[in-house]
Amino acid sequence: MIAKGVSLRYSKALVDIATNPEQIKSHLLALEEFVGILETIPKLKELLFDPHLSTLTKKSILQRLFKDRLDETILNFLFVLIEKNRFKYIVDIRKEYHRLAKKRLGILEVRLLTAVSVSDIPQEKVRIKLQKTYQKEVEIQNVVNPDIVGGMILIMDHQIFDNSVKKRLAKLKVSLLTAKV
């Protein structure tokens, strides 16, 4: 629960200091790139997460490795995380920043769960329908889950719209079991 509160507080602060949509996008890309680098270089992650390593050493490592690669705001943000002993939450902060940035940019992220991969045409129809309904730009990520048998499940903004065959079969089963003969 602490991680959620910390990640929300710091990611919100980073979104709030952005002065325009381009800066929000730039910060998002920089955070995603940085976390990606941490994931691909375990030794670097280990060093930066090491509680025995001094703050000054960690900041020096970041400065040497990323001063030409990261925006000054992001580098300073990472320094603050190190100073406040919050760097261990960087992955959660990146996830929360991603969510807040998309929301601030008016982009609705949707996960479309289907039993088989959906071609571009049906996916585009869903995207257009959602765009008209929510008056927002829509980004769809298709996730294949054979367990749902058929139909689809839409997951967006903490809402789930389940129109899967699996759910319909479960409803049918309940109604058959509770039916009075």
From Swiss-Prot:
- Can you say where in the cell this protein is located? Cell inner membrane
| Main location (coarse class) | membrane
State one molecular function term (GO). proton-transporting ATP synthase activity, rotational mechanism
Q: What does this protein do?
A: F(1)F(0) ATP synthase produces ATP from ADP in the presence of a proton or sodium gradient. F-type ATPases consist of two structural domains, F(1) containing the extramembraneous catalytic core and F(0) containing the membrane proton channel, linked together by a central stalk and a peripheral stalk. During catalysis, ATP synthesis in the catalytic domain of F(1) is coupled via a rotary mechanism of the central stalk subunits to proton translocation.
Q: NCBIfam families, alphabetically?
A: ATP_synt_delta (TIGR01145)
Q: What's the subunit arrangement here?
A: F-type ATPases have 2 components, F(1) - the catalytic core - and F(0) - the membrane proton channel. F(1) has five subunits: alpha(3), beta(3), gamma(1), delta(1), epsilon(1). F(0) has three main subunits: a(1), b(2) and c(10-14). The alpha and beta chains form an alternating ring which encloses part of the gamma chain. F(1) is attached to F(0) by a central stalk formed by the gamma and epsilon chains, while a peripheral stalk is formed by the delta and b chains.
Q: Can you say what this protein is called?
A: ATP synthase subunit delta
Look up and give the organism this protein is from.
Answer: Protochlamydia amoebophila (strain UWE25)
